[in-house]
Amino acid sequence: MPLEHRIDHRLRLVLTRAVGTLTDDEVFAYQHDVWSRPEVAGYDELIDMSAVEHVAVPSPDRIVRLASVSAGMDVGMPPTRLAIIAPRDFEFGLGRMYGAHREMDSRNTKRVGVFRSRAEAQAWLGLDGEPPLEV
């Protein structure tokens, strides 16, 4: 399973880890499957891209589409945050591109931050007092 996740209700956080080869179809499926659940409304999100070995390169249009679909799922939701851990340049760039397009969408309520380390991501989410969070 390229995208593994768990829901931490105590922290109000969805933790996700991408593993191996990642395709945009898997990312779209994850977005729909996880974020259409009412119990995660208003939760922050932490996505760890550290274990990704290959990204099946999506077209820029697919990144824009994913950002639009994601923002569309935010309608009526309180403001939340998404921290992406991306130690390598390629995944870091994709995360920044996704975040920029998502934040330009007027329906968006989720701030996106892209970080090189877990410690930076957890601090940005206000979870720096927690042990390293894992899926």
Question: For each predicted feature, which ranges?
Answer:
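Amphipathic, Lys/Arg-enriched alpha-helical "gate/interface" segment within cytosolic domains
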Residues: 1-135
